[in-house]
Amino acid sequence: MRYVVNPQLVLYVEKGQKIKRALYLTPYGTLDDKSPIYYFLSTHLKITDPEVHKRHILLTLKISQLKGYLCDLLRIRNDVIIYSHKNNLEYSYVDNTIFNPFAHTQKKTLIKSDGFLYNIYPDACDFLVIWVADAEDTSIAEFGSYEDVDVNILKFETRLLEVFDDLDLDMTIESKFNNIFRTNLKFTGLRKLIKKINEFNGSRYKSLLYKSDEYFINLTGNKFILTDERLNLTVWDSDGVVTFSSDGDTIMINNVKLFTSLLTDIDLQMERIKGDVTYKIFLSTPITSRIKLNIETSFIFVETATNNILLSADKRISIILAKNHISIKVKNYIPNIEKYFTFLVIAINSMFNNIQQASDFTKVETVYWSRICQNTKNKHRKPVIVSSLDEDMEKVSDNFYKSSTKEVFINSSGIMFSCLDPLNKYNYVGFLSIFYRLQKMCIPCCFLKNQSHTETFSSCVYQKEIASDVINPYILNFGKVVTKSKISFLPIIFDSFFNEGVKIIFEQDNKRLKETIGYHVIKSCDEDIKRLRTISDIIAFVNEDKNILIAEDIIYFPMNYVDIGTRVYILIQEIVHEIVVVKKHMSKDAIEVFPPNYKLVKNLFPRQTKFITIRSDSGMELTTDGFLVDGKEFNVDLSSNYVAFTKNITTPYTLSKYFSPLFKYAITESKNRFMKTWLINTMLRLGIDLDLDTNILPKLEKYYPNHGKSV
């Protein structure tokens, strides 16, 4: 999702609140006639041609700083009053009604504020409209004032607008609300809530009211699972995210809008225990996590002793920076504030911390090449700077010349590089592909062999773009995230397992693939990037995708053997990759990709049952693989406005021992709950009552033989 910085509106009015100037501010520099601001301007104020300024009011300013900025923007030096039709800004009444200097009621006591704009004006990120009036034109001229602008704010705004067009504002956001209250809901209140959920939002939300005691488990809703609590109401949205959860005494609320909509006729007492929001924002383009600010920015951030942690100016928002994501913790919910602060971080990173450009590599006294291009005793890989071209050199392109003994590359600054190895080995000029792929920087390096056949050489010398779908023959070591054009080795243990007896030939002195008739490697998935951060994420992904996934040294299978597909995934730094077979002929550059030999790992599945029908009646079958209706699996979500109940059980030693060989293969966040669920389902399927039936093992051996081992 690409974040769009919304336009802002400044209205300068005269007597009678007549608008004499309408300033439309936007960092894009053009008017967006589809924006809510323009709709308000054209429809409600009947202004269709406002002044368009490439400017931006920082939402982190205090009201006094904002007033100084507005005075400078409007080029006025007299006392003014600033206000808004949506929120109180500079002044407010005791009863918090909206202040308007042209409709002032003396009976109400005015309170002056110098708070931060985004706190005082909660919709500021989406819809900021500020009215400015000359104090002498109002009935309360004594309340007006003038502020000088902070020049540092103008300097920052100028720098921000300079880099704005180049900012990558694509981001993916995950949020976690920590709104926890004490309540008086109890069981009766929870029953009312789930009844409303089932009546009005049953198709959109999943819900479960769960109550248990020593003997029975009672369930109501449309998502039937076991929990570890005696009493619990949980509601999930369509993405499987918990919207709110309560045990009757406390409640955790993630979706405030949904929860409040259910309270129309419920007398609820709530006492806040904790309230904040944590956002995790994943960036499309990496940033420098350790920000160093070159100008005064205290009106935006407060720097801390840890240089990857920032605080907002009011110290109520904390920001933790990492290379590929930002974590933002907000004390109170403010619409889209996390996107706005992410925008500011990306902008500041671009202003002050951008990776140095190629010109920095041309100064002899500060030359730095990566570790793979340094001189050693027997290798001279770092190119030298030469002052001129030899007479016998031929022009290959505008920036590359060669003779029978030497090659010269000329960078964008006119600096000439050549490879003059005293041992006469590393004489060919090439380029470091990692710098070009990441930053489009052509950093020369010296090689043993001619590099003119490489993609990076073609890009730097002939300005040809690298085809992103062509696989690079260099095989990365396992552990790095694999991009579209790369492949990497499997972890050692799985490399040995998948590639036992398979021959692979590499180029001399490196890991460039030369030839193989079929070798298992890792490549990126062709689909969108998929992140799995928790065990729950992994389990859900495997069961939904119905394919095998490897994470660290564990192989995750779908629950049913018959569901296992033909793809094999592997997790690297929380990102899903896939295992494939590559083939390459020595005489060809192309690398062919084929599906993996999935049967190698599928045969490791610990529980392979025979399909056995337990009961059958009127086209319905209860089997060891599930419940079938007319031969098809019954997978319709069940829903109940009534209470369904089953016997509660403890885990008898006999059953636990019988299934223990199977349970050791189950990967779950709550092993005891999984075992309990398994046993309840098994007893229900087989029609066994633990209190009455003492001859259990023979029945288990019939349908689940050999103590849960493979059959």
From Swiss-Prot:
<protein>
    <recommendedName>
        <fullName>Early transcription factor 82 kDa subunit</fullName>
    </recommendedName>
</protein>
<comment type="subunit">
    <text>Heterodimer of a 70 kDa and a 82 kDa subunit. Part of the early transcription complex composed of ETF, RAP94, and the DNA-directed RNA polymerase.</text>
</comment>
<dbReference type="GO" id="GO:0045893">
    <property type="term" value="P:positive regulation of DNA-templated transcription"/>
</dbReference>
<comment type="function">
    <text>Acts with RNA polymerase to initiate transcription from early gene promoters. Is recruited by the RPO-associated protein of 94 kDa (RAP94) to form the early transcription complex, which also contains the core RNA polymerase. ETF heterodimer binds to early gene promoters.</text>
</comment>
<keyword id="KW-0010">Activator</keyword>
<keyword id="KW-0805">Transcription regulation</keyword>
<keyword id="KW-0946">Virion</keyword>
<comment type="similarity">
    <text>Belongs to the poxviridae VETF large subunit family.</text>
</comment>
<dbReference type="Pfam" id="PF04441">
    <property type="entry name" value="Pox_VERT_large"/>
</dbReference>
<dbReference type="GO" id="GO:0044423">
    <property type="term" value="C:virion component"/>
</dbReference>
<dbReference type="GO" id="GO:0003677">
    <property type="term" value="F:DNA binding"/>
</dbReference>
<keyword id="KW-0238">DNA-binding</keyword>
<dbReference type="InterPro" id="IPR007532">
    <property type="entry name" value="Poxvirus_early-TF_lsu"/>
</dbReference>
<keyword id="KW-0804">Transcription</keyword>
